[in-house]
Amino acid sequence: MNMKILVLVAVLCLVVSTHAERHSKTDMEDSPMIQERKYLPPGKPCYEATQKIPCCGVCSHNNCT
């Protein structure tokens, strides 16, 4: 009886660790800290309130500087 419980616990630990490892890899791939950031170069038009890609400098008079 004790051996069955021990085997069950070992199998559950293996399944949980495999599942967690798989999810940690996808989290690393989706992480914005690891992905290369994209910026608008100077001279490109920008709109501070609605732009999705930030300027590499500052958005001034609707142009990246």
Curated annotation (Swiss-Prot):
Keywords (A to Z) from UniProt: Calcium channel impairing toxin, Disulfide bond, Ion channel impairing toxin, Knottin, Neurotoxin, Secreted, Signal, Toxin, Voltage-gated calcium channel impairing toxin
Disulfide bridge partners, by residue number: 46-59, 55-64
Coiled-coil zones: none
Q: According to the UniProt entry, where is the signal peptide?
A: 1-20
Specify the propeptide location in this chain: 21-37
Q: Which GO terms describe its cellular component?
A: extracellular region
Expression across tissues is:
Expressed by the venom gland.
Highest taxon, organism lineage: Eukaryota
Please give the Gene Ontology molecular function terms for this protein: calcium channel regulator activity; toxin activity
**Domain topic, free-text comment:** The presence of a 'disulfide through disulfide knot' structurally defines this protein as a knottin.
Which family is it part of?
Belongs to the neurotoxin 36 family. 02 subfamily.
What this protein is called in its record is Hainantoxin-X-3
